[in-house]
Amino acid sequence: MSGGSADYNSREHGGPEGMDPDGVIESNWNEIVDNFDDMNLKESLLRGIYAYGFEKPSAIQQRAIIPCIKGYDVIAQAQSGTGKTATFAISILQQLEIEFKETQALVLAPTRELAQQIQKVILALGDYMGATCHACIGGTNVRNEMQKLQAEAPHIVVGTPGRVFDMLNRRYLSPKWIKMFVLDEADGMLSRGFKDQIYEIFQKLNTSIQVVLLSATMPTDVLEVTKKFMRDPIRILVKKEELTLEGIKQFYINVEREEWKLDTLCDLYETLTITQAVIFLNTRRKVDWLTEKMHARDFTVSALHGDMDQKERDVIMREFRSGSSRVLITTDLLARGIDVQQVSLVINYDLPTNRENYIHRIGRGGRFGRKGVAINFVTEEDKRILRDIETFYNTTVEEMPMNVADLI
């Protein structure tokens, strides 16, 4: 192993190897390259990176792209908003043999939206190379998909575990030339019950395959995957300080009772001439309920959740991305799949039930130095959760000031 530190397997504390008790991995790779030009990337890929608007690699890109390109198995612990999608997109594109029209990389993601988001990033970065990428997701026509995959194998397939397994199983997707396997948001996939499908997909791939795993948290089921399927992985931790709560102003509003949240939201609407906002709730049913209530009061809002069919979800996301719909009400399912540049306001109508989702929700707001505002509605019962979030992220959430509109 080159590049890793000498105490590669030292264990100074209990818990699984390379982990500290807080479920945070310990890095064993110290090389940092802080400039895309110094990464020995193909000229056409560099053009794509700069055309996409990247100027300087983010913390995770500075650390993880090189070991990925060198072919190491890599575990990267990083949240959304850190530039992780581009990290593995660049690594895959650099290793592609473009003239060879076979599928050479496979990416798994927990939701359709995230899979499509990843596909967009890969196609944009690989634009000058002529890279092809197909999104393999449920909710779309299976027959069309088979025809597409058979007509010409895409260089890269990105998809949700269920549909990808289906395509491998029916032999429409050939594992023969796949040399790189990426699991994005592994914690999200395992918590959604995709474990069996992921294990079955591994069984179908070459044993020599390079595995790259990205995860915001490292629960035991994720560690189990790394132990079972990865060889001497490079471990890279993007520490919390480097994450995107920086630049996001976080506030709370005391709402004495749950039923007063609706009025609070409507009051905010009038105060804030918002560019675009996402409102998070904890259940699909509540999303429908709030959407109806807002419509009844003549506020224009769109709703998005996992019970909707794919076409409907696509239309709503398109309207929101283009700015023709300005307020999106949704659940955590989509916190991971929405990357909308203009969102400057996130409202947690419900505080997330687990604190990891907090950064998934508001890490959207201030991407890479863009400013953003997060407003949390807090009832008496929620105060403890909010304090827990503050401690976990080492951050402070202040009471919302009167002039909040000026901050957005």
Swiss-Prot record:
ATP binds at Q77, A78, Q79, S80, G81, T82, G83, K84. SUPFAM superfamilies: P-loop containing nucleoside triphosphate hydrolases (SSF52540). InterPro entries: DEAD/DEAH_box_helicase_dom, EIF4A_DEADc, Helicase_ATP-bd, Helicase_C-like, P-loop_NTPase, RNA_helicase_DEAD_Q_motif. It catalyses: ATP + H2O = ADP + phosphate + H(+). Residues 1-22 are annotated as: Disordered. Residues 247-408 form the Helicase C-terminal domain. Keywords: ATP-binding, Helicase, Hydrolase, Initiation factor, Nucleotide-binding, Phosphoprotein, Protein biosynthesis, RNA-binding. The keyword Ribonucleoprotein does not apply. Residues 65-236 form the Helicase ATP-binding domain. CDD domains: DEADc_EIF4AII_EIF4AI_DDX2 (cd18046), SF2_C_DEAD (cd18787). A motif (DEAD box) lies at residues 183-186. eIF4F is a multi-subunit complex, the composition of which varies with external and internal environmental conditions. It is composed of at least EIF4A, EIF4E and EIF4G1/EIFFG3. Interacts with EIF4E. May interact with NOM1. This is Eukaryotic initiation factor 4A-II. It comes from Macaca fascicularis (Crab-eating macaque). The gene is EIF4A2.
